[in-house]
Swiss-Prot record:
It comes from Vibrio cholerae serotype O1 (strain ATCC 39541 / Classical Ogawa 395 / O395). The gene is acfD. Disruption in Ogawa 395 results in decreased cell motility. A lipid is attached at residue 17 (S-diacylglycerol cysteine). Residues 1-16 form the signal peptide. This is Accessory colonization factor AcfD. The keyword Cell membrane applies. It comes from the Bacteria. A lipid is attached at residue 17 (N-palmitoyl cysteine).
Length: 1520
């Protein structure tokens, strides 16, 4: 992945930047050359001896492993493959800038080279080879800035800033010590990253119950459970066929009786009675065949193929046990098994009853058993034990089994909760899609988007809809390869914000809503029926694709989508992406097993036709596969006895095309004419034999009518049903297509649209209101839901207005603008393209169109009711003029139908097609999965990741609560509650109950694996070991039980690792707290530490008196980590910790509580100066307060606190020894208070509790209000995060040192700065910048300079010039902070605060050199809050309080006013608040927002002097 970092480079280094030329190194003609990093370096000359120099083929790597692509040029050639002569030097450049020189790297006399193909490593270049530090730092730089996929590395920079950053670090910092270089890089990454996750379809592997009212139509809204059975091929007459019965190793089984409606016999014996011993038997296609030994039923199967495996004769255990029984009694050699006559004779002595005597349904080991009505259960293995006693033993002894090996030795030990086929299917899909780095590294080609052809119909000039016929897998011999999504956001790719919520309502994101649109993900995506399926017949494969047009892709893989032709054997077009070529390369590789194109492909298709406009077949071409797929395409007239080694693949069509024989405008010319089949019965039989012998067949056809023709027999034999009728892919532009009057539409190019909900009548007032309410907390309530009126669900619409035109005709206009209608054109009407090859937008024309739309909607004040939308990441906002990027697919005609549709493919999409199971089987599967990892693969069974995640998510719903689950042995156990409650009892020392107990065998396994402590563990016996750091993907059961322990106190977790045990038990008693509420800032609240600790699972009591409002008691301040991806992969503590209770007020004055893990106790509320709390059963925690230890450092709790006048600091108690901290804990507390004072100063706040607009966040007049900083072993996001409390990811229990220095901690300043940031600096894009103003102030104030920006400010001038007018939008947090640093440094010499005060300056100003530049910022803060200030000598109207202008303009106006200098050029160059927009398939960013002309005009109207010193030119920081 690419990690974007920020710095500076020269203009010539950029990719595609305007007005810039590419600079290339000058290479002397004699082969020597200069080195840009070492200009004097020459060399590489070898004497000419009259023999041509050998030509050497080269590739360039970073380190011998990571291979560069064409982004790096070496000797002006692609670095992935370039050639030089032996005596040449090698010069490598990126965008014309020299990066490496190799002086005569292949001097044979020097290097001993003896091959013609070589690999160079960049770190071995002349510039780096002699310096290990430079080599290490170069690799750090490359790996942080480049894009890496597998073993490929690419240095294509997406922005000016990336390129300049790379250059800066490359040229100036490679000699830094590695640690410093790494810190500088990662600091930049962290800073800039701050600037800028389904329920799947679920097919249980148990027999479903039938529900009345269902339909067998797979496209109906209520489909029956066994609907797939109705798709099986049913012959219209008898089709005699020959098959074989095999064991799992492919050996034929002889001597087994078989019968069906049409046949009866013994395997391996022909109809004449001849013993063939080939396992053969005759059948009629489609019959149900049963197999037996005399009357003992081995099972049955449907006869739709020619090879039948005995394990397929029954479900799971029944099939496996049938094979085990055959193995037990048969005589076996390498190729065959024979049931002796003796076995049949003995069985015949027990007719029918033998089926009761020997049960094939008994499980072996801990397996899942079908107990009927969709229920399963884990039961002990009993199959072989039945032969130890009773009649089964007598029969067994009479036969004297030839093979007595145990079932578990040859067959799987258990049935997994998820079929083992699922993981195999996932692997195959990954290969066919090229979906993972792993398969790509093995040569499978990535398919990013899959092309869906549209029907060749013509309505209003538009082509037809997307066409992909369903190809449904109806047996486990087949599986879907591709299914299109059918959820209500189907056209939006995974990872992007949804257009609709789960109720198909728009997300209301307008202020003051706090709604954040959900992302499209696996969790909420659903799928239609497959249109590509892959099945197996014997050794071979059959793949079906639901559209005949795909044949044309094989002829012209880059020229098939629209209007393709072939002339003189050459495709006329080559503009289509490689995705479909890659897909078919993967398909042919998988079907043939060949990694090269050196194969012969057979076919019965003479010609292909290319998609074009109109109701036509399209341009015709001979069906000759492109050379990248095969070396020869051979036309076949017969499929009999084909050699699968000579022709490993056949591509077929089953029917002729309708062609011109169409009778309706709805007919599709290239659909199958089912009345004109191309395959006979013998053809199909031959094809089945061909596939069974190892050949593969690929069929791409548009069969619209369900039929039972011969092709259906071929497909059925592979487990596929085809020709169901309707297309299973929706048009890719979304449900509204590109219609301008329909919401959520999309087109080829960007559109501007206003979408809105019409007002509804309020039932109580009769007034017109919006159909939703934005609550005070920012949440949304929909009135029709609240009022339970489902029929009144509002409908989203495109805003429209009506105008009268000539003749008073009323015309409806829609708030819809197609950006393509506003492209620049030359005088001949041709579109003008920019240097990037994109059409240039006529901004003037577009602005007129947007203004026309916006001016059409006015509010009651005559102002525009709408403005342009603000969220550049979300393209489905409502109530504003939204820009929605196009999808680059041309639309056609008056119905705005796209030429084609494409479907996003990738690893996430591949993982979306899996299955799950019930409670009992799920929990057992998770245990077996965990067992697998705990024994390092020696036992247990691993689940593939998709199944693991699905099961895990499902189980979390059932487990993360305190419900009492019960098993009723008198009822069918559909949900598996027996096993489920057994596991709960294992984790609760049998306190879960539920009519079950923990099985001793399971308990022993859990203790042996270290999941639960055994009896030898003393007081810890029965507790669970949380196994920190806990990766749910390896230990899912432990993770789920850890989650449940938060609610279910019967599950006890070992707390020794976290949060820690108590060491002494003294504690409790009375404390009195000042709980008055004088809070001035939310982030410095009045939650009070009590100095008490609640011990895990030990009840404690709290009583209250003196309160005037309820008191909230909180135990443990800790983030909820549940579901956070990175934490879940390495969880260091219980994900949920905090518990809260209320006492006093309307609640009881005294209550008793118990908590699962323990924690410090806090109190909040009360609203009284004297609130008395009485604790019983609690433990003293170390507490330093009022300058002394109220509870000693050696108190029993593992975590303690330092409470200064303005701060609470929470950390492991050993940290509070404060070793190495000058002045110790006392000074630490003072430094915390100094930071609080500096914070108040920076924001120009000097008022106490009785103040108004300038109240301090903390003050002696508000003694119970404090900032809070909590150290924890894990927090929700980042290394730290803001809030109340601020959380820090640092928890070293063994350290005796404090981890924070209040006057030298960027982390502390940064996070508290988030809390306290104020206008006018909080412009768009300043979230991770405005907070750092406080940090920068603290650094300057206490460390003597602004070292954080010291490096970046050096090249600020060049950067701003390179990105003039949008430097803010192009920059990261580091660059944006430099803008403010330049302003501060400018103010250091150009601004005098005394000009604003007649009398003594307030104390928050500092006139010390090096610091006084901050006075400008403090004044701006003050002016923003106070329209008038008696102390300030106002200079006309306070421009910082001007309303009605944007935040960017206000910042510029306020700064200019405060500085009494026209700073508009400075702000215009940086353009704070500007945003970068990236559009599909366009690497060039576009910038919007920021400073406006009207804002500049406001500044100009002040008639201020221009700055004598240009702040943009400042390139250093003051050191003092």
């Amino acid at each position: 992945m690419k990690i974007r970092i920020v710095s500076l480079i020269v203009l010539g280094f950029l990719i595609g930047c305007k007005h810039e030329s590419i600079i290339t190194p000058t290479v002397p003609a004699d082969g020597s050359g200069g080195n840009a990093l070492n200009p004097g370096l020459v060399g590489g000359y070898l004497p000419d001896i009259g023999v041509p120099d050998p030509i050497i083929s080269l590739s360039m790597t970073l380190d011998g492993n990571l291979k560069f692509d064409s982004s790096l040029l070496c000797n002006d050639q692609d670095a992935s493959h370039f050639q030089i002569s032996q005596k040449d030097n090698v010069f490598c450049t990126i965008n014309g800038r020299s990066i490496a020189t190799f002086t005569a790297p292949f001097d044979a006399n020097k290097n001993g080279r003896n091959t013609d193909s070589e690999v160079l490593s960049l770190i071995s270049a002349d510039e780096y080879r002699d310096s290990p530090v430079r080599q290490e730092n170069l690799q750090i730089l490359m790996k942080n800035m480049a894009t890496i996929h597998g073993d490929k590395i690419s240095l294509v920079f997406r922005s000016t800033l990336d390129a300049l950053t790379f250059e800066n670090y490359l040229r100036h910092n490679l000699d830094l010590p590695k640690d410093q270089f790494l810190e500088a890089i990662t600091e930049k990454i962290a800073n800039d990253n701050q600037v800028d996750k389904q329920p799947s379809t679920h097919v249980p592997n148990i027999s479903p119950s039938f529900t009345p009212g269902t339909s067998s139509n797979l496209n109906s809204p209520f489909v029956s459970a066994n609907a797939e059975e109705s798709l099986s091929y049913i012959p219209t007459d008898v089709i005699p066929s020959l098959g074989r019965l095999l064991d799992s190793q492919g050996r034929v089984i002889n001597g087994v009786s078989y019968f069906s409606n049409n046949t009866r016999g013994i395997t391996g014996v022909d109809k004449t009675g001849a013993i063939l011993n080939d396992g053969s038997f005759e059948f009629s296609w489609g019959d149900i065949i049963s197999f037996s030994i005399d009357t003992f039923e081995l099972g049955s199967t449907r006869a739709n193929k020619t090879d039948f495996y005995i394990s397929e004769l029954g479900k799971d255990n029944e099939g496996k046990n049938a094979e085990a029984l055959i193995h037990r009694y048969a005589s076996i050699d390498d190729s065959k098994l024979i049931i002796p006559d003796k076995v049949t004779q003995i069985f015949s002595l027990y007719p029918n009853v033998i089926n009761e005597v020997i049960s094939l349904s008994l499980p072996n080991g801990d397996i899942e058993l079908d107990i009927g009505d969709g229920k399963t259960q884990i039961v002990p293995g009993e199959f072989f034990k039945q032969f130890d006693s009773g009649l089964a033993a007598l029969i067994d002894q009479s036969i004297s089994p030839i093979s007595r090996f145990k079932f578990e030795d040859s067959l799987p030990k258990k049935k997994s909760a998820i079929d083992s086929e699922s993981s195999q299917i996932q692997d195959i899909i990954n290969k066919l899609w090229g979906a993972t780095d792993t398969v790509q590294a093995n040569g499978w080609k990535k398919v990013d988007r899959f092309h869906i052809f549209h029907d060749s119909t013509n309505f209003y000039g538009s082509t037809g809809s997307a066409r992909a016929q369903a190809a449904v897998n109806i047996a486990n011999s087949a599986f879907p390869v591709l299914m299109a999504r059918n959820d209500n956001n189907y056209w939006i790719d995974f990872g992007k914000p949804k257009a609709w919520d789960s109720n198909s309502l728009a997300f209301i994101t307008e202020a003051p809503s706090t709604v954040v649109p959900d992302k499209v993900s696996e969790d909420t995506s659903t799928f239609n029926l497959p249109f590509i399926s892959l099945g197996e017949i014997g050794k071979g494969k059959l793949m079906v694709l639901g559209n005949a047009r795909y044949n044309s892709v094989l002829v012209c893989p880059n020229g098939f989508s629209w209007g393709g032709t072939v002339k003189n054997g050459t495709c006329s077009l080559s503009s289509d992406r490689d995705d479909m070529a890659n897909f078919f390369s993967n398909v042919i590789r998988y079907l043939t097993g060949s990694t090269s194109n050196d194969v012969i492909v057979g076919t019965n298709i003479p010609e292909v036709y290319f998609k074009s406009s109109g109701q036509t077949m399209g341009s015709k071409a001979n069906f000759e596969l492109d050379s990248r797929f095969s070396k020869q395409t051979q036309q076949l007239t017969s499929f009999h006895d084909l050699d699968v080694n000579t022709i490993p693949l056949i591509i077929i069509n089953a029917y002729d095309y309708k062609g011109k024989n169409i009778n309706s405008p709805y007919d599709i010319p290239l659909s199958a004419d089912v009345g004109s089949p191309k395959l006979s019965r013998s053809d199909v039989t031959d094809l089945i034999d061909y596939i069974n012998n190892g050949g593969s067949v690929l069929m791409m056809e548009t069969i619209i009518n369900t039929n039972n023709s011969e092709i259906s027999r071929l497909l059925d034999s592979a487990g596929i049903a085809f020709g169901i009728g309707n297309s299973v892919v929706a048009d890719g532009n979304g449900p509204s297509g590109g219609h301008p009057d329909r919401p959520r539409s999309q087109r080829e190019h960007g559109i501007w649209v206003i979408e809105r909900y019409a007002a509804v009548e309020d039932e109580s007032s009769g007034q017109q209101t919006l159909p939703y309410v934005i609550n005070s907390d920012g949440s949304i309530e929909w009135k029709y839901i609240v009022e339970n009126r489902p029929d009144d669900k509002p409908k989203l619409e495109v805003a429209s207005w009506v105008e009268s035109e000539a003749g008073d005709k009323l015309i409806t206009h829609y708030a819809f603008i197609d950006e393509s209608q506003h492209w620049k054109k030359d005088i001949s009407g041709k579109i003008i393209y920019n240097v990037a090859g994109k059409p240039e937008v006529d901004n003037a024309s577009l602005s007129l169109a947007k203004n026309k739309v916006l001016d059409a909607f006015k509010n009651s004040s005559g102002q525009r009711a709408y403005s342009e939308c603000k969220n550049s990441e979300f393209h489905y906002e409502i109530n504003c003029l939204e820009y929605r990027p196009g999808n680059s697919i041309p639309i056609t005609g008056g119905l705005y139908v796209p030429r084609y549709t494409d479907i996003k493919l990738g690893e996430s999409e591949a993982n979306a097609m899996v299955k799950a199971a019930n409670l009992g089987t799920n929990i057992h599967a998770l245990y077996q999965h965990e067992r697998y990892f705990r024994t390092k693969g020696k036992s247990g069974a691993r689940l593939n990741s998709v199944d693991l995640n699905r099961i895990y998510q499902n189980m979390s719903v059932w487990l993360w609560n305190d419900l009492d689950y019960r098993y009723d042995d008198k009822q069918s156990d559909e949900l598996g509650f027996k096993v489920f409650t057994q596991y709960l009892n294992c984790y609760t020392s049998n306190n879960a109950g539920g009519n079950t107990t923990c099985p001793e065998e399971l308990k022993d396994e859990l203790t042996q694996l270290g999941m639960i402590y055994d009896e030898k563990s003393g007081s810890y016996a029965g507790q669970m070991d949380p196994s920190y750091p806990l990766n749910y993907m390896e230990k899912p059961l432990t993770r789920l039980m850890l989650g449940r322990s938060f609610w279910d106190l019967d599950i006890k977790v070992d707390v020794r690792k976290y949060p820690g045990e108590v060491t002494t038990r003294s504690g409790g008693g009375d404390i009195t707290l000042d709980m008055r509420n004088n809070t001035a800032a939310w982030f410095a609240g009045n939650r009070q530490p009590t100095g008490q600790w609640a011990e895990a699972h030990q009840p404690f009591s709290v009583s209250v008196s003196g309160e005037t409002s309820p008191v909230t008691i909180t135990i443990a301040l800790a983030d909820d980590l549940t579901g956070r991806e990175k934490h879940e992969l390495g969880l260091k503590r219980p994900p949920r910790m905090s518990k809260s209770f209320v006492i006093g007020g309307d609640s009881p004055k005294m209550q008793t509580f118990t908590v699962p893990y323990g924690g410090l106790i806090y109190a909040q509320g009360g609203n009284s100066q004297q609130v008395k709390l009485t604790f019983s059963g609690t433990i003293d925690a170390p507490l330093y307060i009022d300058g002394k230890w109220r509870n000693p450092l050696l108190s029993g709790a593992p975590i303690g606190e330092v409470v200064s006048d303005t701060f609470i600091f929470t950390a492991p108690k050993a940290n509070l020894n404060a070793d190495g901290y000058l002045g110790g804990i006392e000074q630490f507390a003072k430094d915390l208070d100094q930071f609080s004072a500096d914070l108040n100063d920076f924001y120009a706040r000097d008022e106490g509790a009785d103040g108004d607009k300038n109240r301090k966040a903390t003050d002696k007049s508000m003694p119970n209000n404090r900032h809070h900083f909590v150290n924890d072993v894990a927090i929700s996001v980042g290394a730290a995060h803001s809030g109340y409390p601020v959380m820090n990811d640092s928890f070293i229990t063994s350290s005796r040192s404090l981890n924070t220095m209040p006057l030298n901690s960027w982390l502390l300043w940064h996070e508290v700065g988030h809390n306290s940031a104020e206008a006018p600096f909080n412009v768009d894009g300043a979230t991770e910048v405005v907070n750092n103003l406080l940090a920068l102030y603290m650094q300057d104030r206490h460390q003597g300079k602004m070292s954080r920006v010291e490096q970046d400010i050096r090249y600020a001038f060049d950067f701003v010039n390179a990105e003039h007018g949008h430097a803010w939008g192009a920059g990261g947090a580091g660059e944006r902070l430099v803008m403010f640093a330049q302003l501060k440094e400018w103010a250091e010499t150009e601004f005098d605060i005394n000009d604003w005060y007649n009398d003594k300056l307030p104390g928050f100003y500092i006139e010390e050199s090096g610091i006084k530049g901050w006075n400008l910022f403090k004044l701006m803060h003050r002016l923003m809050r106070n329209e008038n200030d008696d102390q300030i000598n106002m200079k006309g109207e306070n421009q910082c309080k001007i309303s009605g202008i944007g935040k960017s303009d206000l910042l510029m106006l306020c700064a200019s006013y405060a500085a009494q200098t026209d700073l508009s050029e400075f702000f215009k160059a940086w353009n704070p608040g500007s945003k970068a927009f990236l559009y599909p398939d366009d690497p060039q960013p576009y910038y919007e927002g920021g400073i406006t002309p009207s804002g500049i005009q406001r500044v100009k109207s002040l008639k201020l002097n221009l700055p004598q010193k240009n702040p943009l030119s400042i390139n250093s920081v003051t050191q003092h």
